[in-house]
């Protein structure tokens, strides 16, 4: 993992999320719900929800990083647990701030498989070492 960290100002964040929403819209993807990965994905998911007109937002609290450059061996879901109700036909957009190693996104995608019709991922930043290649960056 790179030691270099980028500070994202509010202005840069706003631009990044608008561009991310435009990528999703231009692709023609119309998610039925957005799943935020807490904590970094909370604001991303909320902003995408407004921009894309998606009112169904879910939150999944996954712990992988325990500090700067410190992480667990594997991601762990923390309570309260996500409970999808009658979502077999739903298209879901998973939102997070960054795909660093990609392990969190891989965990969340695996969790969603079989519970929804389609899963796509959207992040503000994707690192080169990420094992997951996100649909929208």
Can you say where each PLM-predicted feature lies in the sequence?
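PRPP-associated nucleotide enzymes
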Residues: 1-137
């Amino acid at each position: 993992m790179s030691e270099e960290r980028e500070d994202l100002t509010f202005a840069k964040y706003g631009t990044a999320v608008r561009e991310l929403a435009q990528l999703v819209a231009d692709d023609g993807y119309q998610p039925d719900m957005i799943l935020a990965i807490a904590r970094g994905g909370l604001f991303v998911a909320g902003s995408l929800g407004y921009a894309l007109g998606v009112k169904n937002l879910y939150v999944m609290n996954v712990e992988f990083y325990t500090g700067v450059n410190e992480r667990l061996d594997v991601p762990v879901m923390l309570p309260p647990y996500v409970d999808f109700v009658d979502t077999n036909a739903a298209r879901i957009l998973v939102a997070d701030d960054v795909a660093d190693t990609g392990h969190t996104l891989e965990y969340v995608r695996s969790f969603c498989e079989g519970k929804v019709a389609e899963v796509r991922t959207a992040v503000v930043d994707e690192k080169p070492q990420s094992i997951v290649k996100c649909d929208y960056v």
